Amino acid sequence: MLQMILNVTGMSLRNLLKNLVKFLKPSNQIIVGLLFLSSSLYSAVQIVQPSENAYEDIQEALILAEPGDVIRFTSGVFNLQDSLSLDIEGVQIEGEGMDQTILNFSNQQSGAQGLSVTSDNVTLQDFSIQNAKGDAIKVKGVTNIKFLRVKTEWTNGPSPENGAYGLYPVESTNVLIDGCIAIGASDAGIYVGQSKNIIVRNSRAEFNVAGIEIENSYYADVFNNVATNNTGGILVFDLPGLPQQGGHHVRVFNNRSVGNNTDNFAPEGNIVGEVPRGTGIIIQANSNVEIFNNEIGNNDTVNIAVVTYGNETDDETYYPHPKSIQIHGNKFGPTGY
């Protein structure tokens, strides 16, 4: 009977109990209140399978989700025409593996991202996003975001027509990117901007303009990653004209930044379009940056560059020079040829 009521009303058990309380005597409200508390202890798992209505099915699950819920995509290819968005906190979105669960945006008609997240305490894991019209996954203004074994890719190879960013958390706190892969972004494959308390580890960036980029951010550790076949492997940048400036305390260690010799394919006018082909690591206008125990080689132009921001700016608060940079214990291969 309860399941029949839920099916007819379209409510979750938690919402049904909330509404029921309004019509009961105080003594019975206590009982229903205890039932509500019990229901809240258990997260709902919503399973979504590929179908002709994949966009509607997924977006409905994202809209109706409640804190603590899991939205699980089964194996298969989900062909999507519009951008997805999540603004409910405490939700986990998961697939059955980055090579098994694929959200395909090749025919995307609207939206600036594949998936947009604007809520706290979200975990994204075990799925891929392909050929998004803009950024693959953008996360903005959140606390506690995890990307675990997520893959973003533009499958037609390097092109200025590709979306700008693969994984794109910005203006966020407590960012974890672990075991991810980013391929083919026309700006940066893995990008963390204007954020603080950041870990990027065990991930791979390939055939992007910038493989991994930490920009205008505080307290970042980038380690155990591979950046290869990009224009530039790993970038630590600070730029003017942004709400958060003065990037500092970034550690880049135990990474391989090798063979980053792909021609720069950024759209005209992008700042990353100035990165020379064949760059291992660039530090620009940051302070307290430590680069150690990395393998850096076979980058045609330079293995490590420490540079001042050289463009003119009207931002009087911006400091364009790097300071307190430590580089030690790295293994260098051929460069500058």
Pin down the residues of each PLM region.
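Right-handed parallel beta-helix/beta-solenoid
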Residues: L41-E60, V77
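Right-handed parallel beta-helix/beta-spiral solenoid domain characteristic of secreted/periplasmic
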Residues: Q49-E56, V70, G90-G134, N156
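Short, T/G/N/S-enriched strand-turn elements that build extracellular solenoid repeat scaffolds
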Residues: I58-L64, N79-I88
